[in-house]
């Protein structure tokens, strides 16, 4: 019924394309007029548009003229004219939607249209790419158009200093990676000086490969962190013990067989000890002297040992060298499961990275304490408007809309797509599958057809490479180990008879041109003569025809990915811009997708029905594969949604802290803020010892005196005051305490320079807030990792998390207030020169900070990547009273810890 309705009235996508086609006609009608303009007249259009925007004209009204201007500038500077479908793509992006455009349709050129239009407001436009190479390339390619029209272009890459970053962000249009933009946001919210902040407002962002960034990267929050205690000995110990544990296979779990030591869940990438395994590891730990004879792993004080054990168990049973990671320069480098790229700098969390370092015998780096973090979901929601481009988003349209509010519009191709997609072939074993792939490659290259083989792991690419070498078939391997050669290998992948093996779509972002990349060939020549260029072009035309006649680029997939979208990305490398092309996937029943997610009974039936070397290729198996992929996609969507629901709690708190922190940073005088905090602190302190509305017998004036002396350096005999004045009531005493705290601070600062006092107050506020926020993030991490246990008590973990996270946040804010007032009371205020010197030291330390992007492994891990050395603490103050640590006995004599007595929260 739905198909019938769509045939009559068209789909929503068709209706949208039809509607915006009218705007495209308007743009086309302006082309003859704009062609007549001189260069100066065309350039002057930019200022004209800016003036009109400043007077209140909407960007939508300007769109036809602005797009016509950019199209004309493209023709004059790059000899590139925007096609009508590219204009449609530009309109989609301007409207804050996702444009799905096939490979080779010119997404980089499309972005110039909405980028120019939205830059006219003066609020800046950010264009996000997946790596530094593409950010630099796209900025350089399109800068001629922007600069011709009077707009400035900046690029943000990893090696820029703060001043260079600030200049790039100040440009009208700024290119960069999602990691760099996100880390700069976090660093700006750690700055102690406005001059150290580099970003301005987040106005409009265009995200290239939006599916990769907003979906594949959604489980990997950005985290800035500092090193914690060294625990390498414990990781080395458990790394030695874990190999003695025996794994229980999946098929043995439901059978009446003798229990083994542990089993794994490959879907969630977790490993679980059995009771036998617990007993075995306890026995080994007692022999090692780590556990006492009467001790056990279930004891609360052994929770850290369980942390090391679990990490090492997962490292040995679930993570494999050359599949999940590689060892490069004596470091563990994670391999992105979606792209096959090596990701230097990223680290797994929850001790997994340290466990793998121990497993591979490389240096174990310390675990880290989170200093600042944010997920990509919540970072991009900070922008006023988000838009995205990709070749494959339609399969993830629901997630993009439900989480980001982004509608996906499929843009028609400029020329009809004529790729031939063959049925999948399914073999009984991996070896039979690879043999069939090699035979297919051999036949195709014999007629001059280039082949791109997509594999799911480095191990698979190397196995296939070995088989091709045995057959003496020349080929290039493109995976995480050859990342540096990526662009040059891809540029020539379209040569007649060339064979290229790429792991999980490494090389995405670079077009494969039939016959090879002509521009790259010409660029490699030194001072070529016109004759040489003409000869190269003639040779390329011949090669191009040979490849087209052979069927175009052939894509071979060595297995299906968990996601249909990744498969479509691989297919999309063929048949660009109306060229011919083919695609075919080879599978085996031992592939991870079918092994983990297809039913065991079905797999056994298929294997029994296949004789050696035989394959299946019919519709039934396609349904099985689609169903398996649907299960995985649904599973991963639930994980991302779950992560977002938990992170939204912290995100609300983050906004409060960062807004308050920015208010401190922007203010030259925080004395009024501190005065309000002193009132809050005095009142809460008073009521800790004198309960509101209580009888005198319940008052603890002696305890209040001790607290005032130890925490605020104030000596008052409150008991004597009360005894001398019978009319002195609760409110009078409270007022007295408040005025005593105010008087003490006024006395301390009355002979000091006002500028020094104001600067020092501000610095103290920022330092104290940062310190408490870091501690709070650590507490939230521990809460997040343990909250699922509440389910055993018939409680909803998410509701419990929200409630306890709020309580932790309230406690943190109260502790912050109390500590900052107490600290200011105890220390000698530094001179203005000392404070400035401390700030300069802090700036230097911040310039050395590194930020890393860790990888989340399962749904129990809400953070990821951590590495970054904590800034050295500056010594800008001197303490007059003794420092009371939070776990020290409270000086009031109650016998409680300070944090549970006078160091506790106040309103």
UniProtKB/Swiss-Prot annotation:
Chain positions recorded as Zn(2+) binding sites: 890, 892, 901-902
The answer to whether keyword Nuclease applies is no
> Which InterPro entries does this one have?
Helicase_ATP-bd, Helicase_C-like, P-loop_NTPase, SEC_C_motif, SecA, SecA_CS, SecA_DEAD, SecA_motor_DEAD
Its record classes its membrane topology as: Peripheral membrane protein
Give the main location.
membrane
Q: Could you tell me the keywords of this UniProt record?
A: ATP-binding, Cell inner membrane, Cell membrane, Cytoplasm, Membrane, Metal-binding, Nucleotide-binding, Protein transport, Translocase, Translocation, Transport, Zinc
Q: Report the GO terms under cellular component.
A: cell envelope Sec protein transport complex; cytosol; plasma membrane
Q: Where in the cell is it found?
A: Cell inner membrane; Cytoplasm
Pfam family membership, one: SEC-C
Give the note describing cofactor binding and stoichiometry. May bind 1 zinc ion per subunit.
**Which EC class, in a word?**
translocase
Q: Where is this region: Disordered?
A: 838-907
Q: Which GO terms describe its biological process?
A: intracellular protein transmembrane transport; protein import; protein targeting; protein transport by the Sec complex
EC number in record: 7.4.2.8
Q: What chemistry does it catalyse, as a reaction equation?
A: ATP + H2O + cellular proteinSide 1 = ADP + phosphate + cellular proteinSide 2
Bias (Basic and acidic residues) occurs at: 838-856, 869-888
- A molecular function (GO) term: protein-exporting ATPase activity
What cofactors are annotated for this protein?
A: Zn(2+)
SMART domains, alphabetized? SecA_DEAD (SM00957), SecA_PP_bind (SM00958)
Identify the residues that bind ATP. Answer: 86, 104-108, 511
Compositional bias ranges of the Basic residues kind: 896-907
Assembly and binders: Monomer and homodimer. Part of the essential Sec protein translocation apparatus which comprises SecA, SecYEG and auxiliary proteins SecDF-YajC and YidC.
Q: PANTHER family attached here?
A: CHLOROPLAST PROTEIN-TRANSPORTING ATPASE, SECA INNER MEMBRANE COMPONENT OF SEC PROTEIN SECRETION SYSTEM
**What is the recorded function of this protein according to its Swiss-Prot or TrEMBL entry?**
Part of the Sec protein translocase complex. Interacts with the SecYEG preprotein conducting channel. Has a central role in coupling the hydrolysis of ATP to the transfer of proteins into and across the cell membrane, serving both as a receptor for the preprotein-SecB complex and as an ATP-driven molecular motor driving the stepwise translocation of polypeptide chains across the membrane.
What NCBIfam families does the record tag this protein with?
Answer: PRK12904.1, secA
Name of the protein: Protein translocase subunit SecA
The record lists the organism as Francisella philomiragia subsp. philomiragia (strain ATCC 25017 / CCUG 19701 / FSC 153 / O#319-036)
The gene name reads secA
